[in-house]
């Protein structure tokens, strides 16, 4: 029976490389997958899943007006798995569509993303994935300043920590840093 998986981690925890690895493993066995990513993430181009170690692949961009369930249901070849990158940016409806893909089409869905933003608030997509997922796993990484587990994301601008502002600002290593709780409140910047 298919399940909805939510795999979350901070920046630099290897979420995207995990997606690319899972896709490769399925496809090596001749089992097609669908890779999707938020249309908001355009760092490396529209509809591109890209890891920090240089691996990249085309993906179906997800906007708030796409009906993910209908899109998957109408594919000529049923996928063995649907893989979602940047799932924190999904809308509530997007997440409910993913649950329908699992429940009605019997296709496993693995959603990868951040859990909380730089203000330690849940993203909309994360909130609903935490509510609906059958299995929830943390992808761990370490704090940039010590060897404790990173559980938070620190936003920086011009080398200074930022605790206020818009929730969504697409960036990379130069803007967001994985940190533990101690270094979130007292970064060594």
UniProtKB/Swiss-Prot annotation:
Its EC number is 2.7.1.21. It is found in: Cytoplasm. The active site is at 86 (proton acceptor). Zn(2+) binds at residues 143, 146, 180, 183. PANTHER family: THYMIDINE KINASE (PTHR11441), THYMIDINE KINASE, CYTOSOLIC (PTHR11441:SF0). It comes from the Bacteria. It comes from Streptococcus pyogenes serotype M6 (strain ATCC BAA-946 / MGAS10394). GO terms for molecular function: ATP binding; thymidine kinase activity; zinc ion binding. It catalyses: thymidine + ATP = dTMP + ADP + H(+). ATP binds at residues 9-16, 85-88. This is Thymidine kinase. Keywords: ATP-binding, Cytoplasm, DNA synthesis, Kinase, Metal-binding, Nucleotide-binding, Transferase, Zinc. Homotetramer. Belongs to the thymidine kinase family. Its main location: cytoplasm. One of its GO terms (cellular component) is cytosol. InterPro entries: P-loop_NTPase, Thymidine_kinase, Thymidine_kinase_CS.
């Amino acid at each position: 029976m298919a399940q909805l998986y939510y795999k979350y981690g901070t920046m630099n925890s290897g979420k995207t490389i995990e997606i690319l690895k899972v896709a490769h493993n399925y496809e090596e066995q001749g089992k097609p997958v669908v890779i999707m990513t938020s249309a908001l993430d355009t760092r490396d181009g529209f509809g591109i899943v890209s890891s920090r170690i240089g691996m990249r692949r085309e993906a179906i961009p997800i906007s708030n007006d796409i009906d993910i369930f209908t899109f998957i249901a109408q594919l000529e070849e049923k996928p063995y798995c649907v893989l979602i990158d940047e799932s924190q940016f999904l809308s509530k409806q997007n997440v409910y569509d993913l649950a329908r893909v699992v429940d009605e089409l019997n296709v496993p869905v693995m959603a990868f993303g951040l859990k909380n933003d730089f203000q330690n608030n849940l993203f909309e997509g994360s909130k609903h994935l935490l509510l609906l997922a059958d299995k929830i796993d943390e992808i761990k990484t370490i704090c940039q300043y010590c060897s404790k587990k990173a559980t938070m994301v620190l936003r920086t601008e011009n080398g200074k920590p930022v605790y206020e502002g818009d929730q969504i600002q697409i960036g990379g290593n130069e803007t967001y840093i994985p940190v533990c709780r101690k270094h979130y409140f007292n970064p060594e910047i």
